[in-house]
Amino acid sequence: MRVLPILCSVVDSRLVSLVEPSALVEEFLPLNRRRTRGDPPLTIAELERWMELRWLLEHSLAGKSPIDDQGRPMRRTLRVPTHLKVRITRGSTIDITSTQEISEGGLFLITRRPLTPGTPLHLEIDDGDLEAPIEVEGTVTWVRRTDDGDGPAGMGIRFDHPDEEQQAAIGTLVERALSEAL
């Protein structure tokens, strides 16, 4: 999309700091809900605005651009820092860990024993305010074996085919984390 390279060249950390984060969140959330659920679909102008807002929020939250070297988004969903308790089940093995961040497409789990990419998992995500944890299937997509400048050791998990109820619950967690992060 033509807006991303232009946006990347114009917006820097000084401009991001001038924008009121709560105003960004207020404008982003309804567009993000419609983009995720597709009802009604976003117009091209709304999609471009969603991409601008996502860039500003990601830059504000992570301090780095979510755009790769060729001007393409690195991820389809906004990652938001949050610490949630997660119970991982893989066969008869159970582990409890926490998140570093979450998005509507997946999460990053902090662990010194990351699993191999491609490993399927059953996740139970609990933020302490839910009546019951959100249960969803996921797959390990990448690992960071040691703590480094990019963050703690752990693994990136993609949510696999969440149903509407799971998507809505995950969306609520992301929205709550976004509101708390800014």
Language model: regions and residue ranges:
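N-terminal helix initiation/capping motif
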Residues: 1-102, 175-182
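C-terminal output/interaction extensions
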Residues: 20, 34, 38, 147-182
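Short strand-loop-strand
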Residues: 79-125, 154-158
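Short, conserved beta-turn/loop elements at beta-strand boundaries and strand-helix junctions
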Residues: 91, 104, 143-149
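Short beta-strand-centered aromatic/proline hotspots
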Residues: 97, 135-144
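A generic structural motif
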Residues: 103, 140-144, 161-163
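Hydrophobic beta-strand positions in extracellular immunoglobulin-like domains
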Residues: 125-127, 140
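Low-complexity, intrinsically disordered
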Residues: 129-133
